[in-house]
């Protein structure tokens, strides 16, 4: 536990030291920055803000996790599969996000990777995690409380759905200063506690290291943000949460611990579906929310969508609180079951 905390502190310090150099390089090279939604006028001032900051905290977190888990890879440790699988997913999804950002910024391709290209790469990465960790572990079921749901060969489909789904869900959440970074920290704290109670210290080290790196990133990402994480950060973080929940055998908990990401994704799906339905039925598309993902709806008019505009800090605080409460309830449920 002590070494895990040292790893977290080291990740925080290195990220804080490295990020200013990244931001300065970005500005000196006059690299194109983040594009903003015109519908949210208060965001227009952020146009040109450096993005791809996730590159820094991912590199820091991966390197420090490897150093502090070196014994896992050299001594045939029982946690080898889970540790290697989690770090592999963080790296590969980070690379996918990096390619997406790179095409948008350096080649001025607005959509980055084509949707089918991004999805194909995410599925391949998810399959590799399945073969690295899940298949060797023999896992093919979901445990929810005292209920076990046998999925057999279909468990691989669940793994792919979970990883790809939450990767993109966190990506949708990363829309205002600090929202995604702190939301993921809250989620990781919950999984860190579960990992500690289960004695999964190698996974705990990865979790605490990423928490440290994200807190270091938040120093520059809180409002007014000096840098954004980009897809390189958000896609990787979402996939990381998914594989950690799988490795700890508490997959279902991500629906609650990750309730903010679920809410953001659900808002987009509902908006699109309702718009298409009303367009077919009435000849014009109608909306449930002022704008999606949900954090933009809050910005434009609060919960009802018709009130005063919310500041980014207020939106952050509201969604962070929801995430923290949901994580606390989940921990109460999980730890009560584990300690019986």
Curated annotation (Swiss-Prot):
Swiss-Prot/TrEMBL catalytic activity? UDP-N-acetyl-alpha-D-muramoyl-L-alanyl-gamma-D-glutamyl-L-lysyl-D-alanyl-D-alanine + di-trans,octa-cis-undecaprenyl phosphate = Mur2Ac(oyl-L-Ala-gamma-D-Glu-L-Lys-D-Ala-D-Ala)-di-trans,octa-cis-undecaprenyl diphosphate + UMP
User: Where in or outside the cell is it found?
Assistant: Cell membrane
Molecular function (Gene Ontology), one example? metal ion binding
**Which residues are listed as membrane-spanning?**
3-23, 53-73, 79-99, 119-139, 144-164, 176-196, 200-220, 227-247, 250-270, 315-335
Q: Which UniProt keywords apply?
A: Cell cycle, Cell division, Cell membrane, Cell shape, Cell wall biogenesis/degradation, Magnesium, Membrane, Metal-binding, Peptidoglycan synthesis, Transferase, Transmembrane, Transmembrane helix
Q: What membrane topology was assigned to this protein in its record?
A: Multi-pass membrane protein
Q: What is its EC number?
A: 2.7.8.13
Q: Which GO terms describe its biological process?
A: cell division; cell wall organization; peptidoglycan biosynthetic process; regulation of cell shape
Needed co-factor(s): Mg(2+)
Short name of one Pfam family? MraY_sig1
Pathway connected to this protein: Cell wall biogenesis; peptidoglycan biosynthesis
Q: Which GO terms describe its cellular component?
A: plasma membrane
Name the family. Belongs to the glycosyltransferase 4 family. MraY subfamily.
**Stated role:** Catalyzes the initial step of the lipid cycle reactions in the biosynthesis of the cell wall peptidoglycan: transfers peptidoglycan precursor phospho-MurNAc-pentapeptide from UDP-MurNAc-pentapeptide onto the lipid carrier undecaprenyl phosphate, yielding undecaprenyl-pyrophosphoryl-MurNAc-pentapeptide, known as lipid I.
Q: Which protein is depicted?
A: Phospho-N-acetylmuramoyl-pentapeptide-transferase
What species does this protein belong to?
Streptococcus thermophilus (strain ATCC BAA-491 / LMD-9)
Taxonomy of the source species = Bacteria, Bacillati, Bacillota, Bacilli, Lactobacillales
The primary gene name is: mraY
